């Protein structure tokens, strides 16, 4: 596998939106235990995926709590192909801060970096404060995919990371545009990619 077969993906967003849980649920779903997530123990994890018959290594970086102290620097963004911008659907402030995270991507990120907007904790339907249609409208304005996930139940977690990988593949490798699936919590996935 050469350098062009490695996609560096960042997870950013406010503290406690579930970035580390999303990372662990995606990279090690069989051993995921929400109560065991240590916010400062994860730097990055790898997972191999296949797109159009070609294997890619997703190198997924987590801020590991640094966002609380605003210590995320340009070096974190260096070489990134994609960014999952995460918020908590039960916390309006985390959604309101998405624009600030988008500005930070523009300030520090690589020109043309792929982005996906992720509303996490969609399993907490009775506590939901951020309407999916509002987030979808914002994502449409930015021209990026939007998806609601639940790291707790696993709903749409794989789909979020695959949407990111598809965006990177299309923008950096030149693959054809995939059919866009923008599921909200509870929506069954329409297509599935081959995961190794």
UniProtKB/Swiss-Prot annotation:
Q: Known PROSITE patterns for this protein?
A: RAB
Residue positions annotated to bind GTP are 13-20, 62-66, 120-123
Q: Where is the lipid attached (S-geranylgeranyl cysteine)?
A: 196
Annotated GO CC locations: lipid droplet; plasma membrane
Q: What are the GO BP annotations of this UniProt entry?
A: vesicle-mediated transport
Cited InterPro entries = P-loop_NTPase (IPR027417), Rab (IPR050227), Small_GTP-bd (IPR005225), Small_GTPase (IPR001806)
Keywords attached to this Swiss-Prot or TrEMBL record, sorted alphabetically, are:
Cell membrane, GTP-binding, Lipoprotein, Membrane, Nucleotide-binding, Prenylation
Membrane topology (UniProt): Lipid-anchor
* NCBIfam families tied to this protein: small_GTP
Which family would the database say this protein is a member of? Belongs to the small GTPase superfamily. Rab family.
Put simply, this protein is called Ras-related protein RabG1
The record lists the organism as Dictyostelium discoideum (Social amoeba)
What would be the name of the gene that encodes this protein?
rabG1
